[in-house]
Amino acid sequence: MPPRRIETGDGRAALEAVAAGEAPRPATATAVRYLLQLLAEKAPGNSVEMRVPPFGAVQVIEGPRHTRGTPPNVVETDAATWIAVATGREHWTDAVAAGRIVASGVRADLSALLPLRP
């Protein structure tokens, strides 16, 4: 069963709550999942796994399909960093350099896909 689609209004409301500060955990979770959903729509595929624990993960970017074990191309970050880079408040390269994004694999650079336009 595919994950429940987050409607645009719900996603934007969650992003506004996070931007206002002190968002409750459910709003942060919705904001993260909404942005992951937008990324998956923008770059469909299965060659890179984008992880934002504990809220979600998606596989994106066309290329070799991964089926078992740890994918060869993985990006992992925390919720605050993901929201910042996905919305353009922080640059991908700055977050990687600071160690807030861990990207491994030849296809794991998502900078060309960001920021998203929620």
Show where each model-derived region lies:
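Feature captures hydrophobic
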Residues: 1-118
